[in-house]
Structure formats: C-alpha cells, structure tokens
Amino acid sequence: MAPLPHSVSPRHTQVADNGRLSEPTDYHPPTEISTDDGTVNILQLTDLHLYFDTPKATHEQDINKDSAHQTITGICQNNSAKRGNPHSADAINHSVTPVIHNYASFEACLTQALSEDVRCDLIVVTGDLVSEIHPQLYQHLYQRLHQSGIPFACIAGNHDVTDEIGKDLPFEQRSFEPHEPDSRLLSRYSMKLNGWEILFINSSVPGQIFGRIGNKNLYWLSQKLANSHHPVIIAMHHHLLPMHSAWIDAHITQDATEFWQTVAPFNALKAVVGGHVHQSSTRSYQGVQLYSTPSTGYQFKPGCDDFTLDDEAKPGYRWLSLKANGTLQSWVVRLEDNAG
C-alpha cells in the first residue's frame, strides 16, 4: 500500500482487538496534520440537513432506527413553496415529489470533491449535519466520512441542538426543543496544520435558530489568539456579518460585536469559515476574511428579505488551501449537472 501524502490522525491508525480498523463510534479527530509540501488543503462541507426519509423519497440508504428499516435523505422542497416562511407547512412538504434529496446531494458533493485534482488533507463540516436529531444519523455520517480515509472534524449548527416539534403546524404554533449536541461535535478544539492553526467553536444555542458564541468561548478564543505563533482560521456555523437578507439576519450570531472586540487586538486571526446562510460569500472585516459556503443541499437566494430558495444555485462546497508562507487561497465548487 502506497504511503499517505500527509501524516494521519490516530483515527486512521486505531486498530480494534480483532485487528480490523475500528469504526468511529467515538471518533478522535487529529490534533495536528503535517504535509511534505507545507500546504494543507481543507474541504469544507456545510448544512447537510440529513433526516429520516419519508416513503415518497427516492434515495435509499439503509440504516437501522429503533430496529425499524429506515432510509436517510434530506429535506424535500416543493417548487411552489420557494417563497415565504422557511418553516411553514407549505415550505416543507413530504407529500410531493422531492426536488432535492439531501443525502444523495451530500454524497455527490463529497464524491465530486474527492475526485478533483486537489489533495484533501482535512474535511471540515460546519454545522447543521441533520434536520432531526437522532444518533443513528450522526453515526451513519461519521462512518461515511471515516470511509474516505481522510481526517475529519464536525461542529454543531442550530439544527444539531434544536428539534422542531409540530412541523405540520403553522410556524408560530410550533415549539423548539433544546438538545445537547452530539458528543462528537467539536467545541473549543484546536488543530495544528503545518504553520497554521484552526480553531473550532460551537456557536449554536439549544432551542434557538440564532447563534451565540458565549463568554466561555470568547475567553478561550482570546487565550488561543494571544498565545498563537501561527496564522489562525476559525470554523463556526453562524454568520458574523449581516447578509442583507432580513429573515436570515434575524438568526445571526447575537454576540458578533463582542466577537470582533475580542479578536481586534490580535493579528493572528486571518479567516473565519462558516455555513448557516446556504450561499457563497467572501468579505473582509478588520483584516479578517469571512467565507460563507453553499449548502450541500438547497440554497437561499441572496439579498431577499423574505425566505426565498435560489432556483439557479447548485449545491456546493468550499476548498481552503493554507500555505506554508501564511497565505490562504479559497474557492467554491458547485455540483456538476451530471453528479448525484
């Protein structure tokens, strides 16, 4: 077997008692990745929104849920429900032919990305892994990422800590049940990437759609930046600057001002990458590059004050290439027409 092009995490070398590669029931992300050429390439995937399928969906990926035969896919969007409240009964309709199958779309994005002529050294999933909280959904996803043979790290989004109860009811009559995030989702976790450092922060709030970093995370962040001798990139879910869409900006990071005050004294922070907004953007603020990334499923139309799906934007993912000289290159790739 040919040697891997980069150092691998303990997750890759962990062997069970029977001599077989152990499945990541409690996977251990790496604390450090090094490459011979000094470049670390990160594949960012976000907003997968996996959930247990309904009989109407056509993608069939079998797993067990409470000993019942189930399938995994994603949210099914109705063409007639592309405007209005994203949580309305019309906007999420399981009785129509699905337009987007989120599991199939995620799988197509992952397969396409790993077939590109780009060496992938780390996969980062920035939240909203699921749309309904079940351990089996996470386990299925972790096993799929594990099968890639590439180190991976996942953080929580709002859907990973909040279950929406009464989806058949009007939005204002529904309740939001808080949950603790899956134990394998990272928070206040750092990883050395050659001459870079990536910090993983949980911005999700159980029972809420908006984000909040919180005092503990901000203090941890200030300590990491104060003691870092490397350029730093942060991975989190919620956006830190308005997207100029009223409906999504109602669910921004609530303590974004405190975040910017916390990082202002430090020059180490170079970039923040996240999801939540289901669209691609690149901006700069206080000398920091901010990247939002398309969902691997459905997209939101930019610049709309009311919830609007983007008919023309395809699912996608982001590459981040961290160079040994402290520079960063990043680009978005969309799913090809013949993929998935």
Swiss-Prot record:
Protein name: Probable cyclic nucleotide phosphodiesterase PsycPRwf_0181
TM spans (from-to): none
Binding-site residues, AMP: H49, D128, N158, H159, H278
Residues reported in the UniProt entry to bind Fe cation 1: D47, H49, D128, H278
Keyword Iron: yes
Lineage top rank: taxon: Bacteria
UniProt xrefs under PANTHER family: CYCLIC NUCLEOTIDE PHOSPHODIESTERASE CBUA0032-RELATED, PHOSPHOHYDROLASE
Cofactor: Fe(2+)
Cofactor note: Binds 2 Fe(2+) ions per subunit.
Lineage start: Bacteria, Pseudomonadati, Pseudomonadota, Gammaproteobacteria, Moraxellales
EC number: 3.1.4.-
InterPro entries linked to this entry: Calcineurin-like_PHP_ApaH, CNP_phosphodiesterase-III, Metallo-depent_PP-like
UniProt keyword annotation of tRNA processing present: no
Species per Swiss-Prot/TrEMBL record: Psychrobacter sp. (strain PRwf-1)
